[in-house]
Amino acid sequence: MRGIIYCDKLETGLAEFKKIIEDYANIGITCDKPVANANQARVTFNNGDEWIVVRATEGSARGHACNVAYIDRMIPDDFVETIIMPTIKAFPYQAYRYYNWGTW
């Protein structure tokens, strides 16, 4: 399973990333050391799942594919519809959720 956390600002994406790592740890699934740079972060878990954090920019967000997407609510709706939604390969399910609701 591959998951992507799309974020408007890397800090908000990394906060959600840490929550996911904690959730996996709580059910006994460990991970390799997360790797991060200026535009994205990545972690692979011992069950084979992979999660990455990607900034929602034209250059960074294109070309990815995932089974599950977590989408920062601060990302404009037109960007979500045209760039992010086509990357989700979990049909017929809608395998996405929004996060970062509290900053509106």
Segments the model singles out, each with a brief description of its role:
Residues 1-104:
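Short, flexible loop motifs at catalytic/binding sites
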